[in-house]
């Protein structure tokens, strides 16, 4: 076991601060319409040019284990915000950094860290309520296009493409990304569905960076049974291996020996395979599996139909053009089974007419939407592999942002909302908080201008001057960094999803509170640690 380095009090917080400063410096340069790019060295293949906070944050590792702890904490802000809203990671990092710097100054002056954290938490809740209050619902494809454009770094073609895709599959529809074969990026609507179950084991992932499994031209084994013994799977595994195609197993569960064997096959590359839990419960699970079977042209292996896994053949398998599996969702893009899907939808329509239960009607409507909505596939085109990766990241951000906007509405973008809420928070804090809790709230008040200040500085102007000017303007008015003017943000199309703003604020405040209340760090000792601490002293 390696020797550990233990730091207390100011030294501990200073070590965290070092890591937080370094990560923020690398990520912050990408913020706003005039944000710069960051080049990431790749061990294999060409360097990657990115403008995406979470991607940069994942790449940063420091020699100094103590400072690296600070990097890991701030990386968590980006990751949590990305998980919750799919965008806004850079804003969350900049906001958290500002809170930490402001908070450490006050702690050094003698303020109580625990009281400061309570103040930050209460102030954050007030702001979350205010953001929800100011959010406007997304009414048309123009608003969707605006959100997508901003999320993709002011790329209007991306915004228009997302709006076109949503127009085809509906605001609740599924949008999937695929690498195209040409220079042009195109939208295609195909048969498909998405359900809320992800991979059973992370060992099934094919893209470790994004933690996603993507399998093309796959066979689908559908069963309502729990699979524990590998013997039941051996015949079908052998048949699929001979075809050279991947296999996706959708079952009640896959456990023990069966799961271990599948993982081993995947890791060895014997057969590309992934296991997914079937969606729903009880009879609803059987209905959903039957829907998937209709969509993919397969059969459900079930005792109800007299079929067993041991006797399953390739003809009973479903087929999918592409299957994309994350830890939470599975998206199936199938070949054309239009007639069968249409007949199934008509059958569900009849069931809706016949049932009196409002709960049953709701669940049947959900099934109908899943089955008939289809999937909009955006085929990403680019001249080079480097451009392809960058374009896919931008499109991913834009899709996540537009879906978040549909869920919770939009607010003025470009850091404007947070700047306008600062005076309201200041008034509320003075009325409801005292002592060090009030100091905690004021730390948040002063930090709220950090994202706008960074956007302005990335555009080559004085951030402080612009922030003070924006504070004097109406709530919907802010600074357009691309054209260097003050505009109505809704009219100009500079908007952020309320969900993204809220998630970034919540996660930034949470990690900042943890850093400010840290009294001790224990990390592995290294030569770099010793040198850095000597220099810091």
Swiss-Prot record:
The cross-references to PANTHER family, in alphabetical order and at most eight, read: 60 KDA HEAT SHOCK PROTEIN, MITOCHONDRIAL
Q: What class of enzyme is it?
A: isomerase
User: Which NCBIfam families does the record cross-reference, listed alphabetically?
Assistant: GroEL (TIGR02348), PRK00013.1 (NF000592), PRK12849.1 (NF009487), PRK12850.1 (NF009488), PRK12851.1 (NF009489)
Listed under GO biological process in this entry are:
protein refolding
Protein name (Swiss-Prot/TrEMBL): Chaperonin GroEL 3
Function, as annotated: Together with its co-chaperonin GroES, plays an essential role in assisting protein folding. The GroEL-GroES system forms a nano-cage that allows encapsulation of the non-native substrate proteins and provides a physical environment optimized to promote and accelerate protein folding.
* Coiled coil spans: none
Q: Which EC number(s) does the record attach to this protein? A: 5.6.1.7
Question: Which key words tag this protein in UniProt?
Answer: ATP-binding, Chaperone, Cytoplasm, Isomerase, Nucleotide-binding, Plasmid
Annotated GO molecular function terms are: ATP binding; ATP-dependent protein folding chaperone; isomerase activity; unfolded protein binding
Its annotated compartments are: Cytoplasm
């Amino acid at each position: 076991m390696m020797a550990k380095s233990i730091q207390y009090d100011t030294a501990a917080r200073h070590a965290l601060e070092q890591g937080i400063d370094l990560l923020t410096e690398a990520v912050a340069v990408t913020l706003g319409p005039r944000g710069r790019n960051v080049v990431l060295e790749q061990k294999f293949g060409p360097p990657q040019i990115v403008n995406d906070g979470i991607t940069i944050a994942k790449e940063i590792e420091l020699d100094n284990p103590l400072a690296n702890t600070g990097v890991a904490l701030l990386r968590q802000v980006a990751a949590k915000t990305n998980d919750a809203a799919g965008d806004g990671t850079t804003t969350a990092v900049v906001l958290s950094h500002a809170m930490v710097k402001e908070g450490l100054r006050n702690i050094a002056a003698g303020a109580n860290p625990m009281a400061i954290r309570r103040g930050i938490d209460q102030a954050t809740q007030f702001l979350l309520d205010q953001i929800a209050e100011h959010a406007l619902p997304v009414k048309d494809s123009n608003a969707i296009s605006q959100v997508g454009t901003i999320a993709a770094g002011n790329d209007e073609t991306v915004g228009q493409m997302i709006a076109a895709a949503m127009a085809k599959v509906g605001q609740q529809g599924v949008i999937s990304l695929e690498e195209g074969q040409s220079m042009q990026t195109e939208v295609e609507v195909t048969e498909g569905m998405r359900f809320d179950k992800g991979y059973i084991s992370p060992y099934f992932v094919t893209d470790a960076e994004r933690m996603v499994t993507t399998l093309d031209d796959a066979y689908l084994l559908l069963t309502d049974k729990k699979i524990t013994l590998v013997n039941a799977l051996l015949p079908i595994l052998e048949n699929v291996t001979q075809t050279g195609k991947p296999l996706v197993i959708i079952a009640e569960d896959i456990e023990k020996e069966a799961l271990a064997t599948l993982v081993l096959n995947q890791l060895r590359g014997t057969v590309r395979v992934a296991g997914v839990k079937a969606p729903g419960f009880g009879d609803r699970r059987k209905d959903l599996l039957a829907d998937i079977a209709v969509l993919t042209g397969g059969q459900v292996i079930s005792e109800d139909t007299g079929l067993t896994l041991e006797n399953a053949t390739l003809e009973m398998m479903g087929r999918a053009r592409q299957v994309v599996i994350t830890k939470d969702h599975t998206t199936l893009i199938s070949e054309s089974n239009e007639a069968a899907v249409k007949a199934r939808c008509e059958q569900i329509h009849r069931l809706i007419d016949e049932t009196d239960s409002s709960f049953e009607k709701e669940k049947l409507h959900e099934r109908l939407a899943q089955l008939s909505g289809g999937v909009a596939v955006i085929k990403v085109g680019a001249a080079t592999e480097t451009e392809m990766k960058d374009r896919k990241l931008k499109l991913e951000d834009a899709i996540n942002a537009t879906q978040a906007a549909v869920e919770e509405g939009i607010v003025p973008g470009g850091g404007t909302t947070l700047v306008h809420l600062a005076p309201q928070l200041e008034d509320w804090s003075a009325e409801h908080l005292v002592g060090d809790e009030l100091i905690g709230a004021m730390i948040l008040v002063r930090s709220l201008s950090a994202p706008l200040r960074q956007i302005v500085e990335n555009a080559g102007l004085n951030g402080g001057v612009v922030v003070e000017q924006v504070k004097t303007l109406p709530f919907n008015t802010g600074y357009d960094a691309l054209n260097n003017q003050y505009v109505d943000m809704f009219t100009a199309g500079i908007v952020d999803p309320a969900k993204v703003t809220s998630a970034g604020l919540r996660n930034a405040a949470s990690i900042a509170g943890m850093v400010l209340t840290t009294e001790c760090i224990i990390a592995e000792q290294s030569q770099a640690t010793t040198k850095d601490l000597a220099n810091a002293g």
